[in-house]
Amino acid sequence: MNPLVYFRIFNNEDCPCGSGKKFKECCKGKTDQEPVQSKKPPEVQIMEQMRKSMVKCCMHPDQSNCNGKIKNAHALQNNKIISLLAGTERHVYTMDKKRQPLIIPIEGEEPEVMVEFSRVSANDATTETCFCDRHDNIAFAVIEKGAPDFDVNSEPMKFVYAYKAFIFEYYKQEVSHKIFQQCFKKRPPVFQLPQMVGLYRVSQLRLKEFKPVKRHFDSEIMAGTYNGIETCVITIPERINFANYTFIAPDYDLNGKG
């Protein structure tokens, strides 16, 4: 297939604005709603919109039993990993999505967008508004405050660590996709540029890959089981002052199979 087809919106596909209508019946041919053309690249506009519009919701599958406010849930455990990094001053350095991204001009190429690091309170590090108070306490209790250190033989621990890394990344992808839809609705001509359609295709693909994984996690959580997760533990023989979490789809598995 010609790869160029991924960089255009087709008449009969669902409109990227999220209306549910076909593109030709919705945003095709619409003009830009913004009165003044922004000098910022569209991808920077999306990042800025994300900083302002993080959705508050609970990602736990047991929606009927949500209780309490949507809280700033930590992707990395505040009372374990973050506390070790924060020390007595209770601060860490992290990529700051609340700050204005830097736009680095590169001669003859697209500008590079960079997110700066900032010193932030441990209470604010790696937080997202993606769990209600009840489910934040229940879903991650096995690895949170008062729980023993990580046990390589504990299936519940391995499952919950995998789930936590996944669900926070899934939440961010969903929010990013919704914000793209909002931006497309306001500025169809700008967000039909090839580089923006490319970002949209990547977002579509990620959600397509993520959704069956979420369905698996949801079904296991509701059943109270921990199946379907294979964990590879790599032990570093000394402590390092760095921590991260992510969910990715590698090109090859641990045995080199594609």
Where on the chain are the PLM-derived regions?
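A structural signal for the main folded, soluble domain(s) of proteins
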Residues: 29, 33-39, 71-72, 143-145, ...
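An N-terminal structural lobe/cap that precedes and organizes the functional/catalytic core
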Residues: 6-11, 28-136, 141
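Extracellular repeat turn/loop positions enriched in glycine and acidic/polar residues, especially those
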Residues: 18-20
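Long, hydrophobic, well-ordered secondary-structure blocks that form the structural core
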Residues: 140-209
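C-terminal, charged low-complexity interaction regions
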Residues: 194-258
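Extracellular cysteine-rich, disulfide-stabilized repeat modules
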Residues: 13-16
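Pre-Walker A adenine-sensing motif
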Residues: 2-4
